[in-house]
Amino acid sequence: PMDVLDRIKEQVEGNPIVLYMKGTPQFPMCGFSARAAAALQDCGVSFAYVNVLQDPEIFENLPRYADWPTFPQLWVGGELVGGCDITLELHATGELQKMAKEAAGEDATEG
């Protein structure tokens, strides 16, 4: 079986945008995850997500991998952006929308 750290590496490097969250965007299981997912959805790009409650291995190991202790965790372009606060701040300034569109390979100036 693939080592959990290899799985995480594959997820963050194989997807332009990954949100590690408690629950799913449709059914978030914590307020912070809900707000981070809503901010991302508002950017209008598709993103990958991992429900860490259904993946205890990732739940236990991601904080070590990233040196970031809490969830949600937003990864864009293989880099850790941060948690809920940072995601909402970036969304408020319009920076999240730009990052998301660039990562998704869309021209941020369009639409």
Please place each PLM-identified region on the residue numbering:
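Eukaryotic intrinsically disordered and solvent-exposed regulatory patches
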Residues: 5-6
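Thiol/disulfide oxidoreductase modules built on the thioredoxin-like
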Residues: 64-70
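Local sequence-structure signature of Cys/Sec-based thiol-disulfide redox active-site neighborhoods
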Residues: 9-46
